[in-house]
Amino acid sequence: MKITAVIFCILLVTRAFTSDQNNKIVQFDIGKILNARPVTTLTNNKLTTWTKGIDGGGSGDGYLTLSAALFNGNKQPHALPDDALFAANDSHPEIQLHYSNTDSLHNQTCNISGEGGVEFYIPQNKYRSLYFALTSAEGPSYLKVEFLYADDSTTFEDLVLPDYYDDLPTDHRKPELCYLAHDLAKWGNRNNMTEKDHHNIDLLTVHPDPTKKLKSINIQKKKPGYLVFWAATGEKAN
């Protein structure tokens, strides 16, 4: 009986901790800024081919979901998982990307070629950390992230996102940069595999002022590099 009671208490504590952690994580709605479909999906036994890809200024290559790659005849493909909700691990919380095998119509990412930027509003809260799922092709992308708070004050972070072919340092990766998806293949515009592995979706962590309510985020990119912005997630400060 005592052992059963102890196990029950442990389960209750674990569930409470998990629930508390989940309540602190916010998957931001960035639907208004999405402008590209770089992932081929499989819907009703039919491939919907990517239209604006991950490199070559959008016309080079794209990714496939695992089901799409298997349907395509690829053997043991290094493809994106069918479930676009990436599980939490030691480096990041759950991260929700915007592709789906049940959706053959809507855009999946925000792609920026050359100099440019995007701004999006978020649920006003105090945030400890923000996580941006990104890829940069044709070299690194140089970014400035501006945080606009409810009191109309701002703070900034200047960041460098490496090329999506680059391996991240193995001597305990920089805490602000980790893999979200690692060692991916890529496919041409006829869903022909052009490279079998070694490409990534990186996850960049930034830190707004946790004592202020954040209301919007502005990401500006300098001319070098081709940027694909996949998702944004926030971790509340309290």
What are the roles of these predicted feature ranges?
Residues 19-238:
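N-terminal/edge-of-domain interface segments
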Residues 1-21:
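Bacterial Sec-dependent N-terminal signal peptides
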